[in-house]
């Protein structure tokens, strides 16, 4: 297996806070690697270390076979591009002028590549419209076009769909898949929006409080996820009381929605809830979600998704 990135026992300390604590991971060539973790789990800190914005307190990583403390690491980083938190764009410039500026910074000729990149990210028809008047999704896609100006074969995206509307999420998903499949770009995506990440990733790294809990590929994850009942009710507290009384294994996805993993008769459960004056709004059999799998990995509780 060809490997783009290997992280070995990486640590980052801020006074008394451990942002990363012995984190290790491997990103195979050609993968869409989903870095899964709640806000504050260390995802953005890792990306800052990989891009050279910060230095690790301990441990190391290898990028294209070059260790981060070796002379060739900056050359290796030129094969990588990253968008951290929000894309750096000039809001008073058009999409085309933003790309021209990026090519100037890189010291590369620009005109031949601009039209191709604008078309690739779906911004070919924006004309004289300034980036400041773009939607959030358009600005995110412009950020990716700027990141692609140096022709990288490894792209790091930090929360690329955070804050996007449904149409923007679909457009971003299609773009990420196109970059991976048609341009063979390896992509590392940091995200806490797991329902969307599950539609993209070929590999996953689940992190919690700065350390790696588990690495797994998509096929292994599919095999590991269990059958379950997904239930939406009128009163989540009553549902929990009923399930506890039945000694059921369950996980809440939201205040009134839960996945139940115990083997039980649906009619028995519905009757018990009716007796407790808890209305069942929806019930369906399905595979365990990526979200509940992560909750199970880190030991229970509810997965908190900041909006």
Give the predicted meaning of each segment.
Residues 155-159:
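Catalytic Walker B motif of ABC-type/P-loop ATPase nucleotide-binding domains
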Residues 170-183:
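Helical segment within the ABC ATPase nucleotide-binding domain
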Residues 100, 111-126:
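Conserved ABC ATPase "signature" region
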Residues 51:
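Helix-to-loop junction immediately C-terminal to a conserved catalytic motif
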Residues 227-297:
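Short, charged/small-residue-rich alpha-helical element at the C-terminal edge
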Residues 59-69, 75-76:
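Conserved ABC transporter NBD signature motif
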